[in-house]
Amino acid sequence: VLSASDKTNLKAAWDKLGGQAANYGAEALERTFASFPTTKTYFPHFDLSPGSAQVKGHGKKVADALTKAVGSLDDLPGALSALSDLHAHKLRVDPVNFKLLSHCLLVTLASHHPADFTPAVHASLDKFLATVSTVLTSKYR
């Protein structure tokens, strides 16, 4: 459960991303594909080379979903319900992949905002991404 402090940290951290959220989403995907090559199997129709339009496009989708989630911290299941259905029933993404992408997103954010990535912010972002992952996999049951 996200505390009031976590919610404050998340909103402040997300505000600092500014217009870079989509770029960070794409970079996190690139890190995921490079570090965990099996994740590429879900994108056989994509050009997965760094900087490709398709990776950038999907990175924007990831960033937009997380931005929506940050704006709906009190109702993440409601905010992410359609996305959960999509990943569980249509795309059938292995739940472990959400954890892998979450890790790569944390690395990406820390590399671009080291001064802002305090232990408290890191913990709040980690809890948030774990909660988002749990919500996205809730329809698998």
Swiss-Prot record:
Tissue: Red blood cells.
Binding-site residues, heme b: H87
Any GO molecular function: oxygen carrier activity
Pfam families: Globin
Phosphothreonine found at: T8, T108, T134, T137
Residues at which O2 binds: H58
Residue list for modification N6-acetyllysine: K16
Range of residues in the leader sequence: none
Annotated Globin domain residues: 1-141
Function per UniProt: Involved in oxygen transport from the lung to the various peripheral tissues.
Assembly behavior: Heterotetramer of two alpha chains and two beta chains.
Protein name per the record: Hemoglobin subunit alpha
